[in-house]
Amino acid sequence: MSRNRTLIAYATHGGTTEDYAKAIASVLTDEFKMQVDLVNLRKDHNPNLTPYRNVIIGTGIQKFRMYEEVAEFLEKTNFGDGKVVIFLSSLMPRDEVIKRYINVIIKKNPKLKPLAVEVLGGRMKVLGRTITDKTDIEKSEAWARKIAEQFHVS
């Protein structure tokens, strides 16, 4: 397990979560010289966590549900001693997202103890047209800097 090796495992439907995952990876790679691998959980449901010291998990919320691939991954995975952080892209308020989704997942997997959780703005499309867009790439980049410090310190 490498100290600087980080996995970003995510699921995306409309692309917002993937955009955030790539922005976070870019900050960690370019500014903190961390080795980062991206895995789309819709394609690889069970990535091997052995080589990773840090795991970042990203998901969106659609129809008031966390993406199924991520929910199952969080519920069933034993993260061992790895450092885990979670981000969600949503149009809902932060506290409501944490209460409705993160707290429920932690009850199902009490060993899951994320170092940090962030809610980033989401985007809503109807019939292929964006009707609401609260995407904030700069906020995801700032959060990446914050978690990089936590990864190095703890």
Residue ranges and their predicted role:
Residues 23:
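Active-site signature of alpha/beta-hydrolase-fold catalytic machinery across serine-
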Residues 12-19:
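Glycine-rich NAD(P) Rossmann-fold beta1-alpha1 loop
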Residues 45-51:
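Short amphipathic alpha-helix with an adjacent loop that forms part of the alpha/beta core around
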Residues 7-11:
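Nucleotide-activated donor-dependent transferases that construct or modify glycoconjugates
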Residues 2-6, 19, 27-32, 37, ...:
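FMN-binding flavodoxin-like domain, especially the glycine-rich phosphate-binding loop
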